């Protein structure tokens, strides 16, 4: 699988949609504006769900926008060639998405007032979700077994690098008032409460009926049926068994796939790598 990567500044980037030259430009040239809103995640953490919620909050629950424009056009990917081009030419407030680790992100962000929503998911579920996602595409040649992918994940030799370093890097920003941290598990447990939290962060005041519409149209089933959100528009030659972007949308699926030995190995790495964070900070602990 490593043949599908380009290494840049110690991070393996997916060849199929990220070019090193664009990432360099993002880091050195891209100007973040104070009125921008940035959705940041490590891959397979619920990114598209968050995009859907944020878009629906902006329209007060009206689904016309999310049902007529693909999500990668509503919130372009900063590190993709097409997304970068759109964002650099767009005037006014911009909504954008990125998986980049903190050391590759736009330097201009750190002196701006732009708002960031950073979504975190249990890395065990991230690992399993990522494996099955790539297994269903033609984007990866010779995908190894889950066991080997497990080892690669713990070493950080997967797309966008180490989950642990990604989290450490971005969570260093968590005390800033323009940086909102969300957890996938909390979203699953209390989606409405999470939507309200995002509204408060963005200064948006939605009524009860509008909140219910956001909840309705951002549900797993609604997104699965929305061709603008389920990636069914992706060219067929890029996929094999259908691009399973939305496989289960559950928490705890890793328990169906990890062996006892893998569970113990993961727990040890997690404890070693996440030292320094307060106990109980992560909802899956």
UniProtKB/Swiss-Prot annotation:
Q: Which reaction is recorded as catalysed by this protein?
A: an alcohol + 3'-phosphoadenylyl sulfate = an alkyl sulfate + adenosine 3',5'-bisphosphate + H(+); glycolithocholate + 3'-phosphoadenylyl sulfate = sulfoglycolithocholate + adenosine 3',5'-bisphosphate + H(+); taurolithocholate + 3'-phosphoadenylyl sulfate = taurolithocholate 3-sulfate + adenosine 3',5'-bisphosphate + H(+); 3beta-hydroxyandrost-5-en-17-one + 3'-phosphoadenylyl sulfate = dehydroepiandrosterone 3-sulfate + adenosine 3',5'-bisphosphate + H(+)
Highest taxon listed in the record's lineage: Eukaryota
Q: Name one GO molecular function term.
A: sulfotransferase activity
Tell me yes or no: is Nucleus among this UniProt entry's keywords: no
Q: Where in the cell is it found?
A: Cytoplasm, Cytosol
The entry marks the following residues as binding 3'-phosphoadenylyl sulfate, namely 44-49, 121, 129, 184, 218-223, 247-249
Give EC number(s), comma-separated.
Answer: 2.8.2.2, 2.8.2.14
Q: Name one GO cellular component term.
A: cytosol
Keyword Transferase listed: yes
One matching Pfam family: Sulfotransfer_1
Keyword list, A-Z: Cytoplasm, Lipid metabolism, Steroid metabolism, Transferase
**Where would you say this protein principally sits, based on its record?**
cytoplasm
Which InterPro entries did the record assign? P-loop_NTPase, Sulfotransferase_dom
> Which residues does the Swiss-Prot or TrEMBL record annotate as the active site?
99 (proton acceptor)
Gene3D superfamilies listed in its UniProt record: P-loop containing nucleotide triphosphate hydrolases
GO biological process terms, semicolon-separated: steroid metabolic process
Signal peptide span per the entry?
none
Question: Which of the seven top EC classes does this enzyme belong to?
Answer: transferase
| Family annotation (PANTHER family) | SULFOTRANSFERASE SULT
Purpose: Sulfotransferase that utilizes 3'-phospho-5'-adenylyl sulfate (PAPS) as sulfonate donor to catalyze the sulfonation of the hydroxyl group of hydroxysteroids and bile acids.
Which family, according to UniProt? Belongs to the sulfotransferase 1 family.
Q: How does it assemble?
A: Oligomer.
Q: What is this protein called?
A: Sulfotransferase 2A6
Query: What organism is recorded for this protein?
Result: Mus musculus (Mouse)
Top-level taxonomy: Eukaryota, Metazoa, Chordata, Craniata, Vertebrata
